[in-house]
Amino acid sequence: MMQESGTETKSNGSAIQNGSGGSNHLLECGGLREGRSNGETPAVDIGAADLAHAQQQQQQALQVARQLLLQQQQQQQVSGLKSPKRNDKQPALQVPVSVAMMTPQVITPQQMQQILQQQVLSPQQLQVLLQQQQALMLQQQQLQEFYKKQQEQLQLQLLQQQHAGKQPKEQQQVATQQLAFQQQLLQMQQLQQQHLLSLQRQGLLTIQPGQPALPLQPLAQGMIPTELQQLWKEVTSAHTAEETTGNNHSSLDLTTTCVSSSAPSKTSLIMNPHASTNGQLSVHTPKRESLSHEEHPHSHPLYGHGVCKWPGCEAVCEDFQSFLKHLNSEHALDDRSTAQCRVQMQVVQQLELQLAKDKERLQAMMTHLHVKSTEPKAAPQPLNLVSSVTLSKSASEASPQSLPHTPTTPTAPLTPVTQGPSVITTTSMHTVGPIRRRYSDKYNVPISSADIAQNQEFYKNAEVRPPFTYASLIRQAILESPEKQLTLNEIYNWFTRMFAYFRRNAATWKNAVRHNLSLHKCFVRVENVKGAVWTVDEVEFQKRRPQKISGNPSLIKNMQSSHAYCTPLNAALQASMAENSIPLYTTASMGNPTLGNLASAIREELNGAMEHTNSNESDSSPGRSPMQAVHPVHVKEEPLDPEEAEGPLSLVTTANHSPDFDHDRDYEDEPVNEDME
């Protein structure tokens, strides 16, 4: 492409020389005509001999113009045949010099014939027209020289870039972006010059006999070469300033910023084409602040376009330093920030869940259509669940120990211990999020109205599943009512009014509400004049315990033998939480004031489970088989229902399921009859 443009430049240069010869011939014709008409007044009545002489001159001018066009076409064909193959190594970094810009803008034969046939131009006007044509050609030559210099600079920069192979990739990317910017800038200048030339040509062709001669308008109605050089210096200086700061910006978009900053000047020039004085354009180029260092902020996810991107903040920050001050002062580690962080976790999990559902739907569609999958199926990662006793082979086959670990529900990893119970370790803040439901429900930490009040607008507008159990939400709805009692329809209305998730999704959640009302002992149905209303038994609600453990004495002995490990488990929980500084379950979020209280609640629940086990030794079912009785206790991952897949998995200590009703289970989205009340 580089050699093609070079050949094109040579052909255009010869065309310019031919054009100058043609214009000299036109000058001679104009001089002859002016000499002929000097002795007489410029009247309209012309003799027959003069008319024949003018027609002969017109035919000669047309022949010269045709010869010029034929020579141009032949030279372009020869240059196209002789041009070598394109260099594929540098396809995008060449500046295309358009043929319309490099060819001399002479008057076409049709325009010349129209001017001569009209016989409306006086000799003075024809002389002025030819002078303007010469000025245009001179400025075209200057522009051609400038474009040649720019082409040489590009070639030198390309050679330097090829030889400097040891440069880091980021500097090479910035250099290529600068070359692309220069290319776009030159293309923009060429288009601008073409537009102004077309405007001038239209102005030359619409001269009336009574009008004075047109003023001499220079070609450089856009940026003259000196201003273009100044703009290029600004770009290179901005590039050096970016390199000295040492910021790792691999995507420095000079093209968009520079072109957008020069766009207003281009628009103003086209709208005001006559704003030039003495051949120099008096354009006030806007200050290109987008190239300065201040307009390239540090890459921070919470900062963009001078605005803080913290959810619900949108505070205006002048620069990055003021943003950091604002972030440390307004969004420090407090209850409000942790609640907002927890809500953001819910948003992310909801989006991940939606993505997983769409992927499963796509996979099912492709399987149905017998199309091979485009992405490999991820191998399921089994959870490492280690109990205090060695699991038998039959028990390990029956227990759900190889549950797939989906990426949409990040669970807390369990590190195996050789002897003793498994120790739960939290590696990051995000691993604590999935067990938030069991913290609020299993450990007697009730839902706080302050949490819903703080995030009320978010829950009303965003389609995010609230991070609470159905039982907690039903209790909250009843407690918020003036009479502390609600009918079933009023509970439905509270759900849809407070949460957009329940408004916009299918009404399967109503089944879960009816399940929880009917099967939880803490909800009491009262008959009155209105009909059936539901109330909350707070004492029964506070008695909610983890899943009951029952079995034969051998099972109880296993549990008692593992009771000695409760203290190390609590210590490990406290150490891991303190080590990772988990701020997500504070007063505003879960109603628990400190992490110490949370750990103590866990300890109390574990101790309560032990006491409950000792008190229920006689609850073992006599109809159970010995094989069921010898199954040791293991920690299992409790899967949720399909409709509640967005909820996290939780860790519960389970043995053989008790025949008693599980009062703590959150009955959600199970198919029931609609008439069940």
Curated annotation (Swiss-Prot):
<dbReference type="GO" id="GO:0071356">
    <property type="term" value="P:cellular response to tumor necrosis factor"/>
</dbReference>
<dbReference type="GO" id="GO:0000981">
    <property type="term" value="F:DNA-binding transcription factor activity, RNA polymerase II-specific"/>
</dbReference>
<dbReference type="InterPro" id="IPR032354">
    <property type="entry name" value="FOXP-CC"/>
</dbReference>
<feature type="compositionally biased region" description="Basic and acidic residues">
    <location>
        <begin position="286"/>
        <end position="298"/>
    </location>
</feature>
<dbReference type="GO" id="GO:0061052">
    <property type="term" value="P:negative regulation of cell growth involved in cardiac muscle cell development"/>
</dbReference>
<dbReference type="GO" id="GO:0006357">
    <property type="term" value="P:regulation of transcription by RNA polymerase II"/>
</dbReference>
<feature type="cross-link" description="Glycyl lysine isopeptide (Lys-Gly) (interchain with G-Cter in SUMO2)">
    <location>
        <position position="372"/>
    </location>
</feature>
<dbReference type="GO" id="GO:0032496">
    <property type="term" value="P:response to lipopolysaccharide"/>
</dbReference>
<keyword id="KW-0225">Disease variant</keyword>
<keyword id="KW-0805">Transcription regulation</keyword>
<dbReference type="GO" id="GO:1901509">
    <property type="term" value="P:regulation of endothelial tube morphogenesis"/>
</dbReference>
<dbReference type="InterPro" id="IPR050998">
    <property type="entry name" value="FOXP"/>
</dbReference>
<dbReference type="GO" id="GO:0045655">
    <property type="term" value="P:regulation of monocyte differentiation"/>
</dbReference>
<dbReference type="GO" id="GO:2000341">
    <property type="term" value="P:regulation of chemokine (C-X-C motif) ligand 2 production"/>
</dbReference>
<dbReference type="GO" id="GO:0045892">
    <property type="term" value="P:negative regulation of DNA-templated transcription"/>
</dbReference>
<dbReference type="GO" id="GO:1900424">
    <property type="term" value="P:regulation of defense response to bacterium"/>
</dbReference>
<dbReference type="GO" id="GO:0000785">
    <property type="term" value="C:chromatin"/>
</dbReference>
<keyword id="KW-0539">Nucleus</keyword>
<dbReference type="GO" id="GO:0021756">
    <property type="term" value="P:striatum development"/>
</dbReference>
<dbReference type="GO" id="GO:0008270">
    <property type="term" value="F:zinc ion binding"/>
</dbReference>
<keyword id="KW-0862">Zinc</keyword>
<feature type="region of interest" description="Disordered">
    <location>
        <begin position="270"/>
        <end position="298"/>
    </location>
</feature>
<dbReference type="GO" id="GO:1901256">
    <property type="term" value="P:regulation of macrophage colony-stimulating factor production"/>
</dbReference>
<feature type="site" description="Breakpoint for translocation to form PAX5-FOXP1">
    <location>
        <begin position="59"/>
        <end position="60"/>
    </location>
</feature>
<keyword id="KW-0160">Chromosomal rearrangement</keyword>
<dbReference type="GO" id="GO:0005634">
    <property type="term" value="C:nucleus"/>
</dbReference>
<dbReference type="GO" id="GO:0030316">
    <property type="term" value="P:osteoclast differentiation"/>
</dbReference>
<dbReference type="GO" id="GO:0042802">
    <property type="term" value="F:identical protein binding"/>
</dbReference>
<dbReference type="GO" id="GO:0010595">
    <property type="term" value="P:positive regulation of endothelial cell migration"/>
</dbReference>
<keyword id="KW-0991">Intellectual disability</keyword>
<feature type="compositionally biased region" description="Polar residues">
    <location>
        <begin position="270"/>
        <end position="283"/>
    </location>
</feature>
<dbReference type="GO" id="GO:0010629">
    <property type="term" value="P:negative regulation of gene expression"/>
</dbReference>
<dbReference type="GO" id="GO:0001046">
    <property type="term" value="F:core promoter sequence-specific DNA binding"/>
</dbReference>
<dbReference type="Pfam" id="PF00250">
    <property type="entry name" value="Forkhead"/>
</dbReference>
<dbReference type="GO" id="GO:0060766">
    <property type="term" value="P:negative regulation of androgen receptor signaling pathway"/>
</dbReference>
<dbReference type="InterPro" id="IPR047412">
    <property type="entry name" value="FH_FOXP1_P2"/>
</dbReference>
<dbReference type="GO" id="GO:0000978">
    <property type="term" value="F:RNA polymerase II cis-regulatory region sequence-specific DNA binding"/>
</dbReference>
<dbReference type="GO" id="GO:0036035">
    <property type="term" value="P:osteoclast development"/>
</dbReference>
<feature type="compositionally biased region" description="Polar residues">
    <location>
        <begin position="612"/>
        <end position="623"/>
    </location>
</feature>
<dbReference type="GO" id="GO:0010468">
    <property type="term" value="P:regulation of gene expression"/>
</dbReference>
<dbReference type="GO" id="GO:1990837">
    <property type="term" value="F:sequence-specific double-stranded DNA binding"/>
</dbReference>
<dbReference type="InterPro" id="IPR036390">
    <property type="entry name" value="WH_DNA-bd_sf"/>
</dbReference>
